[in-house]
From Swiss-Prot:
It is found in: Cytoplasm. It comes from the Bacteria. Bidirectionally degrades single-stranded DNA into large acid-insoluble oligonucleotides, which are then degraded further into small acid-soluble oligonucleotides. It holds the Pfam family Exonuc_VII_S. Belongs to the XseB family. GO terms for cellular component: cytosol; exodeoxyribonuclease VII complex. This is Exodeoxyribonuclease 7 small subunit. One of its GO terms (biological process) is DNA catabolic process. Heterooligomer composed of large and small subunits. It comes from Mycolicibacterium paratuberculosis (strain ATCC BAA-968 / K-10) (Mycobacterium paratuberculosis). The gene is xseB.
Length: 82
């Protein structure tokens, strides 16, 4: 259990811009779980909520990038067919 707490703290210390999609998603799930569980003071809850918002935004950026790569690949495939 202590290792899990250390892992959570290390993840929270990692800049969001350096996290991959899966790491962002997993941390976001954990943030939501902690917020839903309750028992945190207001400041801790706000800090978690802000981190969650940043994580959600980064997840959306990763998905938008993946979507663009797929669209580009499909467009290139269609151009090759012509």
């Amino acid at each position: 259990m202590a290792n899990n707490k250390k892992d959570e703290q290390a993840a929270a210390a990692t800049p969001i811009s350096r996290l991959g999609y899966e790491a962002c998603r997993d941390e976001l799930i954990e943030v939501v779980r902690q917020l839903e569980q309750g028992g945190l003071d207001l400041d801790a809850s706000l800090n978690l909520w802000e981190r969650g918002e940043q994580l959600a935004k980064r997840c959306e950026e990763h998905l938008a990038g993946a979507r663009k790569r797929i669209e580009d690949a499909l467009a290139a495939g269609e151009a090759d067919d012509d």
